[in-house]
Amino acid sequence: SEHSFPTRRSSDLVTFKQLKAIGWSAVDANFSATQLNSGRKTIIDSYLSELDISHDTPALNSAISDLSTTIDNSGAFSNALTLLAEQLNPTIQGGISKDDLKFVPGASIDDNLLSDIRLKIETQSGKSLEATEQSDGTKALITLAIYNLMNNGGMIAIDEPETHLHPSAQRNLIRSLKRTGRQLIIATHSGRIASEFDPDNIVATKAAAAARQPNEGLLQGKDEQKTLARWWINTRVELLTASHIIAVEGQTDRMLVERVAELTGRDLYRDGIEILEAGGCQEMVHIINLFGKNGFDIPLTVLIDQDAEAKLAKKLQITPDQLLDRNVHISRADLEDEYVAALGVDKLWNALSTSPTFKPNQITNFTKQFNHSVPDPSELATLCRDKDYKTHCAVLACSFLTPETASQITSVNEVLNEVFS
């Protein structure tokens, strides 16, 4: 089924009465950084003010009275007051004596039995510190925990809870909030936080663009795909706000797409275009499900090798000749074949055979397979796609590409032409 994210229109503004009815409470981005600053009323004071201490009032009053008496009878306090009076007496009209001064507990002045009560936390090192002395990250966790206890019904909205928090603390915070069973609305730039939610509970927003949210129930019952989706969102949250995604099989494909784009005058990242390494063709169908029409509905172009053509078509329940209609492009037979053809054997082979990456005996053994000193294009492509040398060969190839040769890598240019059309 479909669901949508509300747009901002004056007629849709929610009233204070409606917010109160649904139990709405909101935490802004600076909330946690200010609520435990020393020298001001803190969220701990607010939390304590909600306690019912009626049964403990007599004991607390007695303790405060005892403290006041102890201060009054203390020689140290008495001496301090004498010295202070001597300093003040010449400066204040009418004069000041020791009997005019008195040290008292804050609770007796404020008529508040809980005045100036502090929260202390023992650290892993065994040192006990006040909440106001903790790191900004720990302050944020304490603040949000207390806020959640004080607002334990309805919805809670939090703006950028990742502020000041270590990535692992971000994850732990969200898991703790989810365990409360409350409805959460969170604005975040953190992939670690976003990945804690199922994809259909995530709305991607971007200035001057419609909000994007997958169809309700997307990936329901598909735990393997959910795991992959959370991993992609965790590590590449910027994909959710991309203007276009180019999905490639692996690292070397990404390197070549970026280099060809650069040499042919197309700025991928300026225009919000992101490249996603799938980790193999078998994951392409999951990428299409997550980021395509039924998912976040982000313009998506896919590049795969020829040997994956039939497999992907079968998974998408279409014929291979229909792949282009789904924005899937094919490198024939693969990008190694294409960049060898574009660069020419002589230049690339000379660079590879003199590269320190290869030991002399490796080059010798390779050429012995073909009984000649210089391989033909097919043989050189075989070396370049070898898993032990694939990355290094791609790096060398990228370094030798020119605008002219880059324009001859057919499948990559087809992808870029589509993206920039």
Mark where each language-model region is.
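Extended helical coiled-coil dimerization/tether regions that scaffold
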Residues: L51-K139, I146, M150, M155
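Switch/communication elements of ASCE P-loop NTPase nucleotide-binding domains
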Residues: L113, L119-E238
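Coupling/switch segment of ABC-type P-loop NTPase heads
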Residues: V14-Q87, V340-F358
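Activity-critical C-terminal alpha-helical subdomain
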Residues: D305-R385
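Hydrophobic positions in the central parallel beta-sheet of the AAA+
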Residues: S25, I156-I158, I246
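Charge-biased C-terminal accessory regions appended to nucleic-acid-, cytoskeletal NTPase
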Residues: P356-S421
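Short, small-residue-biased leader/transition segments that mark boundaries at the very start
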Residues: H3-S10
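RecA-like P-loop NTPase motor core
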Residues: R179, G191-T301
